[in-house]
UniProtKB/Swiss-Prot annotation:
GO CC aspect terms: cytoplasm
Known function: Molecular chaperone required for IcsB stabilization and secretion.
Keyword Transcription regulation on entry: no
Keyword match Chaperone: yes
Name this protein carries in UniProt: Chaperone protein IpgA
Gene name of this polypeptide: ipgA
Assembly information from the UniProt record: Interacts with IcsB.
Remaining remarks: The icsB gene can be read-through into the ipgA gene to create a translational fusion protein. The biological significance of this process is unclear.
Keyword annotations of the record: Chaperone, Cytoplasm, Plasmid, Virulence
Length: 129
């Protein structure tokens, strides 16, 4: 685990990360958007909840729309929309390799990830409504 990355996060945001036995810590960005930070030996993996509903299994949204949106997010921000296998929840993910990531870049990346989550939620919400 890369302590200096998380110390900087705490310094900037006041968010202290408590990692569980799966090397996962949970944080609320802007006090409303849940994000899981998974710390692997080589990388940090971000997972943000987009929708609590089963968008695909309940036929709420056209999968083609999600695939097109996923392409744009991947191309422009390096993020991907995924479906969690156990819960069928729609999430946004992004992987950062530690050897290329400074503490300041982690903070910047979290802000960009938050922007992508908001952008994706707005897009999905407009498509559903």
């Amino acid at each position: 685990m890369c302590r200096k990355l998380y110390d900087k996060l705490y310094e900037i945001t006041g968010a202290k990360l408590d990692f569980n036995d799966k090397n996962q810590a949970f944080i609320l960005l802007e006090e409303q958007i849940p994000v899981c930070i998974t710390d692997n030996d080589e990388y940090i993996f971000l997972t943000g909840l987009l929708n609590e509903h089963e968008l695909f299994t309940e036929n709420i949204i056209n999968p083609e729309h999600i695939l097109i949106l996923n392409y744009s997010l991947s191309r422009d921000y390096g993020s991907s929309i995924c479906l969690l296998p156990d819960t069928h929840q729609c999430v946004l993910t992004k992987k950062h390799y530690k050897k290329y990531l400074s503490p300041d870049e982690l903070i910047e990346s979290l802000y960009e990830f938050l922007f992508c989550i908001k952008l994706t939620i707005a897009n999905i919400t407009s498509e559903v409504n």
